[in-house]
């Protein structure tokens, strides 16, 4: 699924295009995301004891390709977890990562995982929420935060209002597919600043499906 036409997993051949350098840098030179494998998560209840991939950082223009490679290296199987800590980033790449997570039957949570597998609270905002939505189920770690805001076009557009509406429609379609209530798009539309969702609000939206009592 591409939220903005012409953007997705791709290998640029024409390096004269400005965005090509950003892609190659994110893919091969200095990826904007980092990852580490956790062999056994220390989390409460059904979320605990799983193998996990901890992913943190900003979602860059080549993040989906990078993520697929890290998944293959981690040897995660259905029911394993992606633990997220990210301020957001590229909307299209986030949606593709969410689709990859869903296609592999992985679950998601927000937090920071150390080498022992213990998870501490963290945050997942903006485009990261689309990645989080790809999980099934989606665990809510006590103290972690999910933040949303209105997405707008980042490149010059002839009709920015129409483009913003189109992006909102695409996000709505994606979230609906992932089983999240349409009310999340209403929350996004309220502000361009990050709006942090309360635990009960995220649960009511079905963004969080399984609260975790102890991080």
Predicted regions and their residues:
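Glycine-rich beta-to-alpha active-site loop
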Residues: 102, 106-152
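Hydrophobic membrane-insertion alpha-helices, especially the h-region
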Residues: 1-14
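Alpha-helical transmembrane signal-anchor/signal-peptide segments
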Residues: 17-28
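STAS-typified acidic loop motif
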Residues: 26, 30, 36-66
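Charged, glycine-interspersed solvent-exposed loop segments at helix/strand-loop junctions
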Residues: 149-215
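A short, well-ordered alpha-helical element
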Residues: 59-80
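Terminal peptide-recognition signature
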Residues: 55, 82, 132, 202
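Short, glycine-/small-residue-enriched flexible loop/hinge segments at domain edges that mediate gating
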Residues: 78-93, 107-114
